[in-house]
Regions:
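Active-site/ligand-binding-proximal alpha/beta "capping" segment
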Residues: 68-117
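RNA substrate-binding interface of SAM-dependent RNA methyltransferases
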Residues: 1-75
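Structured adenosyl-cofactor binding patch, chiefly the S-adenosyl-L-methionine
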Residues: 9-13, 24-41, 101-139
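Short glycine-rich loop/turn motifs that provide flexible caps or phosphate-binding loops at active sites
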Residues: 3-4, 20, 37, 92, ...
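Poly-acidic low-complexity segments
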Residues: 2, 50-51, 83, 120-123
């Protein structure tokens, strides 16, 4: 359900595409399609296959994208301070394990949603909604 939610949220906040990597849920599964409320067919969903790292390098080097790693890390830049300088891509990791160190190392910036109290994480779709809302409003 997270994949469908992320696609729906991305479409709602004006993303131009959703890129998936190896190990991602199938964005065209019946469940993801249902949760996306049809947005999977309105927003390009690009499956990068087995080499997401190469795709990310291509986005940065050939298309001047600024890559943002979204992390649970107090040392990362707080989301409210993040301002993209142009085209950007937000990377969301697996809900349990987060982004791999390889993908994080390819990113230009590391950003986080500051958490309070005993709450240490959010559902990946909820977090994606917060990040995408912020980026939609600072562009």
């Amino acid at each position: 359900e997270n994949m469908g939610s992320i696609i729906r949220i991305a479409a709602g906040f004006g993303a131009t595409a959703v890129l998936t990597g190896q190990g991602s849920c199938d964005p065209f599964s019946r469940r993801a399609l249902r949760v996306s409320m049809g947005n999977t067919f309105c927003l390009p969903v690009i499956e990068s296959g087995t080499d997401l790292a190469a795709t990310l390098r291509q986005l940065r080097e050939q298309h001047s994208f600024e890559l943002f790693a979204t992390l649970l890390d107090e040392s990362a830049e707080p989301l409210h301070q993040a301002r993209p300088s142009g085209n950007c891509a937000l990377l969301f990791g697996h809900e349990d394990s987060g982004l791999t160190s390889e993908w994080t190392s390819l990113c230009d910036r590391r950003i986080t949603i500051p958490m309070h109290g005993d709450t240490d994480s959010l559902n990946v779709a909820v977090a994606a909604g917060i990040f995408l809302h912020h980026f939609a409003n600072v562009r």
